């Protein structure tokens, strides 16, 4: 079936010449690189917000019990918008939808600057919520890269996009520290101006360089299924490939946020310095994004199932290391294992998700999966502090073991189906 050209007029030429361009990317062959740049800009912006929003909230809040509300609204707004974002992308195309999402970051940053200048807490809440909207749209960057290529190249395309966060994960907190004092009379306003600039740059990059392309059908089998009636979401959700994708995306993100949120507090409680807690998180962020340079190649060499199981094993190593010792090297090692394990599970889980639907099923499947991931991440973020205070760091790590076990069982179930020659998707 031939997909009609979409987007701006220049893209029609891209569709005409697509067949003559080298695979795997055809007309959108630069899209993964463009999205990697956008991922870097997003990671810079969101890391500034995550670094300073709680402090800014404390500074502005009329009641200090509300100080963390602006921080929470980043995740809450993202969770509320993620389902809507999937259908907007289907209707308007990724180029325009992603640009609108990035524009919300620009507006949110400027609103935050204004609210700090005027000491308005509730307007600041609106600004951070708009950054949460940007986060919801940015989570689809990796899926956009995966959908544009055949099954063989999906994991590599996803890794390319996530690799954009490597430098940004380190640069973001550094930018936050540098820019927070740009305006001496308005502490933190300069940092949120940088957030607005990151959003504006993302808009320009997307509008000038990104190209909407028809989703790759991946194989002859997938091509035949593309012409079949769309399945219900319930039927898709019962397939082993979707179950395994959600198990890895949700478990990986939930465990990562649960441990990462508690780690700096636990380090200080174990008599390490506050600066050590911050350094542990930076090391963890390197672990999260640096494997993106080779995760796709590992999938091609060893297989998707092996990489997923390696991610689970690394998360288990994180828990075992944390339970064995509270020394500073143990914190560094545990958080490094956690970051790499998340990357393997996230790249692998996203690859499975991109294999679980046909083009007509894309919006609802992606939206539902991201909604589940956001909800689990929010739950982990909110629960980490109270559970750490009640049970302690080492017991906290025991709590992730059942989650990892469920993910391992779902992954093994999918792997057994693959070995038995089960058709995909079913």
Model-flagged regions — what are they?
Residues 81-94, 290-304, 388:
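Helix-to-loop junctions at the C-terminal end of transmembrane segments
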Residues 21-79, 243-248, 256-273, 277:
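Helix-loop boundary and gating motifs at the non-cytosolic
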Residues 177, 196-220, 410-415:
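C-terminal membrane-cytosol helix-exit motif in multi-pass small-molecule transporters
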């Amino acid at each position: 079936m031939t997909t009609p050209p979409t987007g701006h007029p220049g893209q029609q030429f891209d569709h005409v010449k697509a067949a003559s361009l080298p695979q795997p990317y055809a007309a959108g062959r630069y899209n993964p690189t463009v999205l990697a740049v956008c991922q870097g800009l997003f990671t810079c912006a969101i890391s500034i917000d995550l670094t300073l929003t709680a402090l800014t909230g404390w500074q502005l809040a009329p009641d200090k019990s509300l100080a963390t509300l602006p921080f929470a609204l980043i995740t809450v707004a993202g969770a509320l918008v993620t389902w809507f974002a999937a259908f907007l992308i289907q209707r308007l195309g990724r180029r325009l939808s992603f640009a609108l999402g990035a524009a919300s970051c620009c507006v949110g940053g400027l609103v935050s600057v204004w609210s700090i200048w005027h000491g308005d807490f509730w307007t600041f809440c609106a600004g951070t919520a708009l950054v949460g909207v940007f986060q919801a749209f940015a989570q689809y960057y990796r899926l956009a890269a995966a959908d544009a290529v055949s099954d063989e190249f999906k994991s590599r395309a996803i890794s390319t996009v996530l690799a954009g966060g490597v430098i940004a994960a380190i640069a973001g907190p550094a930018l936050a520290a540098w820019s927070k004092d740009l305006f001496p009379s308005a502490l933190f306003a300069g940092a949120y101006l940088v957030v607005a600039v990151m959003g504006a740059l993302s808009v320009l990059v997307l509008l000038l360089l990104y190209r909407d392309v028809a989703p790759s059908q991946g194989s002859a089998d997938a091509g035949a299924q593309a012409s079949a009636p769309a399945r219900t979401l319930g039927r898709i959700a019962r397939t082993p490939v979707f179950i395994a994708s959600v198990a890895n995306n949700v478990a990986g993100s939930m465990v990562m946020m649960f441990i990462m949120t508690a780690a700096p507090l636990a380090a200080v409680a174990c008599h390490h310095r506050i600066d050590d807690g911050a350094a542990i998180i930076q090391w963890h962020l390197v672990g999260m994004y640096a494997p993106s340079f080779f995760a796709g190649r590992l999938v091609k060499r060893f297989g998707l199932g092996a990489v997923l199981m390696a991610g689970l094993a690394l998360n288990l190593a994180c828990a075992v290391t944390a339970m064995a010792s509270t020394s500073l090297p143990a914190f560094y090692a545990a958080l490094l294992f956690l970051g790499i394990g998340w990357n393997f599970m996230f790249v692998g889980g996203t690859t499975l998700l991109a294999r679980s639907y046909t083009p007509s099923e894309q919006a609802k499947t992606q939206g539902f999966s991201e909604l589940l991931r956001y909800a689990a991440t929010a739950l982990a973020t909110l629960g980490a502090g109270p559970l750490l205070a009640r049970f302690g760091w080492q017991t906290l790590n025991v709590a992730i073991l059942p989650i990892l076990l469920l993910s391992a069982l779902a992954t093994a179930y999918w792997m057994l189906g693959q070995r038995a020659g089960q058709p995909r998707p079913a």
